[in-house]
Regions:
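Short acidic, glycine/serine/threonine-rich loops at helix termini
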Residues: 9-10, 45-46, 169-170
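Flexible, glycine/charged-enriched surface loops at secondary-structure junctions
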Residues: 18-31, 151-157
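Glycine-rich, small/acidic residue-mixed loop/short-helix segments
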Residues: 49, 53-173
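Single conserved hydrophobic/aromatic residue that forms the stacking wall/gate
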Residues: 1-8, 12
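Short, acidic Gly/Pro/Ser/Thr-rich loop/turn segments
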Residues: 6, 41, 96-97
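Structural signal for hydrophobic packing residues in well-ordered secondary-structure cores
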Residues: 13-20, 38, 42, 162
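Short, conserved secondary-structure transition motifs
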Residues: 25-44
Length: 173
């Protein structure tokens, strides 16, 4: 018997072949998310960061008088003086950084990898990182610690964020 789902799959394969479509799973979707700099709960933020460190400060209504809430003044202060910032990293070599890998300058831990991948679109080894603001400038050289953070290090530098289409000029559909 031929089920509806297999018939749909046949149409997808037949029509998609002409358009260059290929089946892709969650790993491909996650790579695209990282390239685009899209944050994911549980990776880039988990409720332990303020909205500005988490990269969702745009959702906090600090400027309107109608939107008053407990903690508004504290959040204004946090926005003005952030402790951490979400940045992009480009790593040297082909070993991808993983969620939770530590980021160092010398012996000091200055950040943590939130997501990383070998980007097939950009042909680069990239990551998202929450880092102390003093090390968040583009071009800053850091090292990603593997194993215990000290035994093996991967050279990296802070780069523009998001990695892919940073000015959002691609057509949206």
């Amino acid at each position: 018997t031929h089920s509806a789902s297999s018939a749909a799959s046949d149409v997808y394969k037949r029509q998609g072949k002409n358009e260059g479509l290929i089946p892709a799973g969650f790993a491909a979707l996650d790579k695209l998310r990282i390239e685009a700099g899209l944050i994911l709960f549980g990776n880039e933020f988990d409720g332990q960061q303020d909205p500005f460190e988490a990269g969702i400060g745009f959702a906090v209504p600090l400027k309107t008088k109608e939107e008053d809430f407990i903690g508004k003044e504290v959040l204004k202060e946090r926005k003005a003086n952030p402790q951490k910032k979400l940045v992009g990293l480009e790593l040297i070599g082909k070993e991808a950084a993983g969620h939770g890998d530590c980021v160092h300058v010398g012996r000091s831990q200055v950040g943590v990898i939130t997501s990383g991948c070998l980007s097939t679109t950009l042909n680069k080894n990239i990551a998202l990182c929450r880092i102390d603001t003093q090390y968040s400038s583009e071009g800053t050289e850091v090292e990603v610690g593997k194993i215990d953070g000290h035994q093996k290090r991967i050279a990296a530098k802070v780069v523009g964020f998001p990695h892919f289409d940073p000015k959002k000029t691609r057509v949206r559909s």
